[in-house]
Amino acid sequence: MTNIRKTHPLLKIVNSSFVDLPAPSSLSSWWNFGSLLGVCLAVQILTGLFLAMHYTSDTATAFNSVTHICRDVNYGWVLRYLHANGASMFFICLYLHVGRGLYYGSYTYSETWNIGILLLFAVMATAFMGYVLPWGQMSFWGATVITNLLSAIPYIGTDLVQWIWGGFSVDKATLTRFFAFHFLFPFIVAALVMVHLLFLHETGSNNPTGIPSDSDMIPFHPYYTIKDILGFLIMLTALSALVLFSPDLLGDPDNYMPANPLNTPPHIKPEWYFLFAYAILRSIPNKLGGVLALVLSILILAIVPMLHTSKQRSMMFRPLSQCLFWFLVAILFTLTWIGGQPVEYPYIIIGQMASVLYFLTILVFMPLVSIMENYLLKW
């Protein structure tokens, strides 16, 4: 008799995706981050659902409702800090996942890669709207500054900002709609994840060598399920340690002050995972130029497949490209640090230099070095 997992209409889909899926035998731990992102999304949806049961999206009560969750709701503080630090874990896994794709040339699967970029934008939008909900000082001013950037769009900018705000400033209408969208977006993200996996399973996974692995495949279960479970345990242990020992490590102390439109914080900054893009935005003195640079800092990923000039797919056997890749990582760390510093000398000039190097490395240095490596292959 045929196994039910191979005949049942629903189980058949699960089976072909997670059990009998042929996977390359050489996948390293860098391939764990996709499944870790799935766990992060599940944790965020679950904790978010329970938080939404106690949260009120009204400017008069939002801040107090978060305080109420932490003080009066059973294990409310665990829910709140799991959700806040879960977002940080989400972005750590996201950036490592994208970095792995860049390093091993996974971007040559253009459909999967482009859906991934859409996912990145959707998760960033979700996180931004979520940061506004506690209605602390940094929530309010972060929302004001970031939404106000849209006013740089010629002709329709000002109308667009007022349309998003639902008035002439960030107020009750803004908070209510941000809560509605913050609740909705994770489910859109979950749907996009399905499409992401659909396209991935059309082509099969890449592997560290970048060489087709059709001749050397193993079943996903039990080999990679066990490996993924180990990843889950490590990540959930790290998240638990962060939540239980230093829950405010990655947060901003200003957000423990209720939102006050009459008092601007000394330094408005977003959460740490947006600081690199924020530094690029601030490094350009022109408002429209800054907004374009901000969007392009992420959108540049979409043209990476077109800039692939190497004869080899992966960077595994390309030492010069490896050096440039780690140089790019160092630039991103520098930008993240600069984004958290005040706008003054020498931080301004360091941010500008790092921003220029970020775009130059991706657009010019990497394609040129790849061409050079092609010539070295002929020696």
UniProtKB/Swiss-Prot annotation:
<keyword id="KW-0479">Metal-binding</keyword>
<feature type="transmembrane region" description="Helical">
    <location>
        <begin position="320"/>
        <end position="340"/>
    </location>
</feature>
<dbReference type="InterPro" id="IPR027387">
    <property type="entry name" value="Cytb/b6-like_sf"/>
</dbReference>
<keyword id="KW-0830">Ubiquinone</keyword>
<dbReference type="InterPro" id="IPR005797">
    <property type="entry name" value="Cyt_b/b6_N"/>
</dbReference>
<comment type="subunit">
    <text>The cytochrome bc1 complex contains 11 subunits: 3 respiratory subunits (MT-CYB, CYC1 and UQCRFS1), 2 core proteins (UQCRC1 and UQCRC2) and 6 low-molecular weight proteins (UQCRH/QCR6, UQCRB/QCR7, UQCRQ/QCR8, UQCR10/QCR9, UQCR11/QCR10 and a cleavage product of UQCRFS1). This cytochrome bc1 complex then forms a dimer.</text>
</comment>
<keyword id="KW-0813">Transport</keyword>
<feature type="transmembrane region" description="Helical">
    <location>
        <begin position="113"/>
        <end position="133"/>
    </location>
</feature>
<keyword id="KW-0472">Membrane</keyword>
<comment type="similarity">
    <text>Belongs to the cytochrome b family.</text>
</comment>
<keyword id="KW-0812">Transmembrane</keyword>
<keyword id="KW-0496">Mitochondrion</keyword>
<feature type="transmembrane region" description="Helical">
    <location>
        <begin position="33"/>
        <end position="53"/>
    </location>
</feature>
<feature type="binding site" description="axial binding residue">
    <location>
        <position position="182"/>
    </location>
    <ligand>
        <name>heme b b562</name>
    </ligand>
</feature>
<dbReference type="GO" id="GO:0006122">
    <property type="term" value="P:mitochondrial electron transport, ubiquinol to cytochrome c"/>
</dbReference>
<feature type="binding site" description="axial binding residue">
    <location>
        <position position="97"/>
    </location>
    <ligand>
        <name>heme b b566</name>
    </ligand>
</feature>
<feature type="binding site">
    <location>
        <position position="201"/>
    </location>
    <ligand>
        <name>a ubiquinone</name>
    </ligand>
</feature>
<dbReference type="InterPro" id="IPR016174">
    <property type="entry name" value="Di-haem_cyt_TM"/>
</dbReference>
<keyword id="KW-1133">Transmembrane helix</keyword>
<dbReference type="GO" id="GO:0045275">
    <property type="term" value="C:respiratory chain complex III"/>
</dbReference>
<feature type="transmembrane region" description="Helical">
    <location>
        <begin position="226"/>
        <end position="246"/>
    </location>
</feature>
<dbReference type="Pfam" id="PF00033">
    <property type="entry name" value="Cytochrome_B"/>
</dbReference>
<feature type="binding site" description="axial binding residue">
    <location>
        <position position="83"/>
    </location>
    <ligand>
        <name>heme b b562</name>
    </ligand>
</feature>
<dbReference type="GO" id="GO:0008121">
    <property type="term" value="F:ubiquinol-cytochrome-c reductase activity"/>
</dbReference>
<keyword id="KW-0249">Electron transport</keyword>
<dbReference type="InterPro" id="IPR030689">
    <property type="entry name" value="Cytochrome_b"/>
</dbReference>
<keyword id="KW-0999">Mitochondrion inner membrane</keyword>
<dbReference type="GO" id="GO:0005743">
    <property type="term" value="C:mitochondrial inner membrane"/>
</dbReference>
<dbReference type="InterPro" id="IPR048260">
    <property type="entry name" value="Cytochrome_b_C_euk/bac"/>
</dbReference>
<comment type="function">
    <text>Component of the ubiquinol-cytochrome c reductase complex (complex III or cytochrome b-c1 complex) that is part of the mitochondrial respiratory chain. The b-c1 complex mediates electron transfer from ubiquinol to cytochrome c. Contributes to the generation of a proton gradient across the mitochondrial membrane that is then used for ATP synthesis.</text>
</comment>
<keyword id="KW-0349">Heme</keyword>
<dbReference type="InterPro" id="IPR005798">
    <property type="entry name" value="Cyt_b/b6_C"/>
</dbReference>
<feature type="transmembrane region" description="Helical">
    <location>
        <begin position="178"/>
        <end position="198"/>
    </location>
</feature>
<dbReference type="Pfam" id="PF00032">
    <property type="entry name" value="Cytochrom_B_C"/>
</dbReference>
<feature type="transmembrane region" description="Helical">
    <location>
        <begin position="288"/>
        <end position="308"/>
    </location>
</feature>
<dbReference type="InterPro" id="IPR048259">
    <property type="entry name" value="Cytochrome_b_N_euk/bac"/>
</dbReference>
<keyword id="KW-0408">Iron</keyword>
<protein>
    <recommendedName>
        <fullName>Cytochrome b</fullName>
    </recommendedName>
</protein>
<dbReference type="InterPro" id="IPR036150">
    <property type="entry name" value="Cyt_b/b6_C_sf"/>
</dbReference>
<feature type="transmembrane region" description="Helical">
    <location>
        <begin position="347"/>
        <end position="367"/>
    </location>
</feature>
<feature type="binding site" description="axial binding residue">
    <location>
        <position position="196"/>
    </location>
    <ligand>
        <name>heme b b566</name>
    </ligand>
</feature>
<dbReference type="GO" id="GO:0046872">
    <property type="term" value="F:metal ion binding"/>
</dbReference>
